[in-house]
Amino acid sequence: YNTPLGSTEIKLPGFTVDTKAPTSVKIKANKSGIKTRSTSSKNTYSKRIKKSVKFTFSANYGTSGKFMTQYKFVPRGKKASKYKWKTANSVTYKKRNKKVRLYVRYIDKSGNITTKKTNGFYVTKK
């Protein structure tokens, strides 16, 4: 049946199966101009950041709760699949003059996954 929040739940004797991926996912940056986007959106790399940028990750994990949040920075012109995921709830990026985009995946305790990315950006000295 569907819960009031729209989650699909399968009731079996003694437990519930959560089949809904995390929702309301956000990649928050402490600098303006970096947005959370779908992984299918076009990559752009025009956003310049001074010194460094800190990202924090949040989501609604639903019935089963949070298992982990993972991220990876992918350089311009490179495929995301070539880079390994790292586990954290936040990360600071400081590498200068390298155009990158950030991918984040949100995983609940039932193994449901939602993946998002940011628009591309690069960090400068001043």
Positions of predicted regions on the chain:
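Low-complexity, disordered linker/stalk regions enriched in Pro/Thr/Ser/Gly
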Residues: 1-126
